[in-house]
Amino acid sequence: MIIPSLLDTDLYKFTMMQVVLHQFPQAQVEYRFKCRNAGVDLTPYIDEIRAEVAHLCQLRFTDDELAYLRGLRFIKSDFVDFLGLFHLNEKYVSVRPSPQGNGEIEISIIGPWLHTILFEVPVLAIVNEVYFRRTQPRPDLAEGRRRLDQKLALLKTPELADCVIADYGTRRRFSREWQEEVLLTMRRLLGPQLAGTSNVHFARLHNMVPLGTMAHEYLQACQALGPRLRDSQVYALERWAREYRGDLGIALSDTYGFDAFLRDFDLYFCKLFDGVRHDSGDPMLWGERMVAHYAANRVDPRTKTLIFSDSLDIPRVIELYERFHGRCRLAFGVGTNLTNDLGYTPLQIVIKMVRCNGQPVAKLSDTPEKTMCDDPGYLSYLRQVYSVQPAA
């Protein structure tokens, strides 16, 4: 089966899930799947996807896995005790053909946030792997290895010795086996230039650093959970700080557009959080504005970390490193370009939260095509509240 362990997911799912357990245990949510590739027919694979999801829902955390989580400094003991009783419930997820009969599939995940938050990453990995093992039954692994070696060689120059990257590629990987090979190759060829991986399963198996803090769903849910919509970003960051007391201090900057983030990310947050993550829009412009924002708030940018994670490849990593090296701390999360580049067109698939407690939620991405909401009226209202202009 494709998913061997409930740890085969991104670390930020657990860091967010802990906040949900402690602060929002009653929240009810809905997630929806979307494939952005035109003309891709996923309907022939529905039965296989359902079978893999059924297997996922049979998994439990082992004692060794729970001990590993307990050893992470930011994971609290009561959360690990909860995970010892936890399993994913199949009744919360449905996989079916689109009523439009256009080759698209509908995957919806509806239920308590606490009991559905761990579905997204493994379900996406399942869809990806089922699709590629059916469309590419004899993959050209030699080509994948050649491409990977070529990319990693770009980083092995003296002037890039401090350029560090991480694997963020679980959800859109070609296969679990390929992601593992990529990770081990990166460790062998990059050494200390590999910061770690977002995948907790592989981090545990191969003694790597697990990486991650928060995702958009956390900030989106706070639109419904906070006291006032305009204050929901501040509310989310303050609740995060209440949970982690300065640990896991990387804020995600594009849920309401970068202008709104800078308005909310005041002197207090500049000092409190260790840094900020970029996930949409022009990364060069974003980095310049972020460095300037720290300076304007009398915070030395060289003490803060800028993490870039939006559709990166290695040449782009190098460009960003050369632009900002010495001006701030830097980290780069590379996903699909590492874990799904064997010469085939990767699937552009996402699962996004669309409702919380019966209310629509959305993100106003700095890359307009990433915006996903099933209620145009709410999206318009959200833009008005956060002074974000709709894309032309």
From Swiss-Prot:
Pathway: Cofactor biosynthesis; NAD(+) biosynthesis; nicotinate D-ribonucleotide from nicotinate: step 1/1
Enzyme Commission number, as recorded: 6.3.4.21
Signal sequence range: none
Protein keywords: Ligase, Phosphoprotein, Pyridine nucleotide biosynthesis
GO cellular component labels: cytosol
Post-translational modifications: Transiently phosphorylated on a His residue during the reaction cycle. Phosphorylation strongly increases the affinity for substrates and increases the rate of nicotinate D-ribonucleotide production. Dephosphorylation regenerates the low-affinity form of the enzyme, leading to product release.
Keyword Magnesium recorded: no
GO MF annotation terms: nicotinate phosphoribosyltransferase activity
Catalysed reactions, as listed in the record: nicotinate + 5-phospho-alpha-D-ribose 1-diphosphate + ATP + H2O = nicotinate beta-D-ribonucleotide + ADP + phosphate + diphosphate
GO BP term (any one): NAD biosynthetic process via the salvage pathway
Superkingdom in the source lineage: Bacteria
Gene3D superfamilies per the UniProt record, alphabetical: nicotinate phosphoribosyltransferase
Enzyme class per UniProt: ligase
Pfam family, one: NAPRTase
Keyword Phosphoprotein: yes
Phosphohistidine PTM sites in chain numbering: H216
Purpose: Catalyzes the synthesis of beta-nicotinate D-ribonucleotide from nicotinate and 5-phospho-D-ribose 1-phosphate at the expense of ATP.
Family affiliation: Belongs to the NAPRTase family.
PANTHER family, per the entry: NICOTINATE PHOSPHORIBOSYLTRANSFERASE
The protein's name in its UniProt record: Nicotinate phosphoribosyltransferase
Gene (UniProt): pncB
